[in-house]
């Protein structure tokens, strides 16, 4: 493949004079390019919605969401995966981020790590990939061998696969059941896909993980009601969530949370139904953890 033909590798005619610009104009040019990203992502929303439903289906069937990528794309997957346990109260390992070259590549580039299809397959084998898992391949270029190898192995293993790329009709898109391709155009700095392409991928990942967790019962209204209250800030947030969801006072909310070990969902259910902590937990379990269903039935 001639990489120079990729949209993400071409030169941007709006930024040909970066090195001659005064700083205010320099940052203005970057900002003007960034405004294009949301529209590019908007054009992919039907495919993002399919990916959200596939991710939720994977979780409901006992599977995992597995991101894999190289460089910036890999780091973004690891970032999104690492935020899921504290935000949604899910166990570590339910959402996984793989980066070509292993964990060391998060901090320092591992040259050549992305060029092996076999490495992508091997990393999934090491995770004991199961057919109920969802594998999301991330590559701004859309042609990273590590990701192609992983997606190919995942499909052969019976997994649903998603490809996120910033070039149209990319090789990884052809390897996946669902292709999400926000075409953000040439980067302000030629070929530096940590810029618009990275922003677009982050926006897509935000929707996939958050949307899947909504469908998995981890959200009530727009509150992260399965959040783990592990520090002072989060204990305060837990109290505010109970107050906002129920209309009770702060002191009463704190008293309920102390009875639930600061778990928000049973505290809200207790406040709105009069159940005790044990009964609230039992009712939530009967509705697979969906707070709205527990309140309505």
Curated annotation (Swiss-Prot):
Keywords: Carbohydrate metabolism, Lyase. Pathway: Amino-sugar metabolism; 1,6-anhydro-N-acetylmuramate degradation; Amino-sugar metabolism; N-acetylmuramate degradation; Cell wall biogenesis; peptidoglycan recycling. Residues 55-218 form the SIS domain. It is an enzyme of class 4 (lyase). One of its GO terms (molecular function) is carbon-oxygen lyase activity. GO terms for biological process: 1,6-anhydro-N-acetyl-beta-muramic acid catabolic process; amino sugar catabolic process; N-acetylmuramic acid catabolic process; peptidoglycan turnover. InterPro entries: Etherase_MurQ, Glucokinase_regulatory_CS, MURQ/GCKR, SIS_dom, SIS_dom_sf. NCBIfam families: N-acetylmuramic acid 6-phosphate etherase (TIGR00274), PRK05441.1 (NF003915), PRK12570.1 (NF009222). Specifically catalyzes the cleavage of the D-lactyl ether substituent of MurNAc 6-phosphate, producing GlcNAc 6-phosphate and D-lactate. Together with AnmK, is also required for the utilization of anhydro-N-acetylmuramic acid (anhMurNAc) either imported from the medium or derived from its own cell wall murein, and thus plays a role in cell wall recycling. Belongs to the GCKR-like family. MurNAc-6-P etherase subfamily. This is N-acetylmuramic acid 6-phosphate etherase. It comes from Salmonella typhimurium (strain LT2 / SGSC1412 / ATCC 700720). The lineage of its organism: Bacteria, Pseudomonadati, Pseudomonadota, Gammaproteobacteria, Enterobacterales. The gene is murQ.
């Amino acid at each position: 493949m001639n990489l120079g033909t990729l949209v993400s590798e071409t030169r941007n005619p709006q930024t040909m004079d970066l090195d001659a610009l005064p700083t205010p104009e320099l940052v203005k040019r970057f900002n003007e390019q960034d405004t294009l990203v949301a529209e590019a992502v908007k054009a992919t929303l039907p495919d993002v919605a399919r990916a959200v439903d596939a991710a939720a289906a994977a979780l409901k069937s006992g599977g995992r969401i597995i991101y894999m990528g190289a460089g910036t794309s890999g780091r973004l997957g690891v970032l999104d995966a690492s935020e899921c346990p504290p935000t949604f109260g899910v166990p570590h390992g339910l959402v996984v981020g793989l980066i070509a070259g292993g964990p060391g590549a998060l901090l320092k580039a591992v040259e050549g790590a992305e060029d092996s299809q076999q490495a992508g397959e091997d990393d999934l084998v090491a995770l004991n990939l199961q057919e109920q898992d969802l594998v999301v391949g991330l590559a701004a270029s859309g042609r990273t061998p590590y990701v192609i190898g992983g997606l190919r192995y995942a499909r052969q293993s019976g997994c649903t696969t998603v490809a996120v790329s910033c070039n149209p009709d990319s090789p990884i898109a052809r390897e996946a059941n669902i292709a999400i391709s926000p075409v953000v155009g040439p980067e302000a700095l030629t070929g530096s896909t940590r810029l618009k392409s990275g922003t677009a991928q982050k926006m897509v990942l935000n929707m996939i993980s958050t949307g899947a967790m909504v469908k998995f019962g981890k959200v009530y209204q727009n509150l992260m009601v399965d959040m783990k209250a592990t520090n002072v800030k989060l204990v305060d947030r837990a109290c505010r969530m109970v107050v906002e969801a129920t209309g009770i006072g702060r002191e009463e909310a704190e008293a309920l949370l102390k009875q639930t070990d600061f778990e928000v969902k049973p505290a809200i259910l207790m406040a709105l139904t009069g159940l005790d902590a044990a009964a609230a937990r039992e009712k939530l379990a009967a509705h697979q953890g969906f707070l709205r269903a527990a309140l309505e039935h």
